[in-house]
């Protein structure tokens, strides 16, 4: 059953301005080490950062909190599998909030879709609860 749904649309130019204005301070505040390493290895890193920013916003919406209730930007991270497929990993308060959404004896699956077409980056997150066993 679906227990959470979120989406977000980000203007890549806005993220570019944040990168120029705040640089490493912005990157360190918002993105995990894995996200930074992945984005810095790409030619169009502003698009990569924008997609990850949108994914975090969409995930926070799917959790039902937005960026609030003690959830930190780094509590949500986009990781790419060896196939390239992006997945969302939650830690700390985001993981706690996820557990609150689940009925007893259910596990969560977080579905993530991210895309960009300049000047837009977009993300969708669906949180699904599946019975154990």
UniProtKB/Swiss-Prot annotation:
GO cellular component terms listed in the entry, alphabetical order: cytoplasm
Molecular function GO terms recorded: holo-[acyl-carrier-protein] synthase activity; magnesium ion binding
SUPFAM superfamilies found in the cross-reference section: 4'-phosphopantetheinyl transferase (SSF56214)
Enzyme class: transferase
Gene3D superfamilies listed in its UniProt record: 4'-phosphopantetheinyl transferase domain (3.90.470.20)
Record bears the keyword Aminoacyl-tRNA synthetase: no
Binding locations of Mg(2+): 8, 57
Source organism, top-level taxon: Bacteria
Protein EC: 2.7.8.7
Protein family: Belongs to the P-Pant transferase superfamily. AcpS family.
Protein name: Holo-[acyl-carrier-protein] synthase
Gene that this sequence comes from: acpS
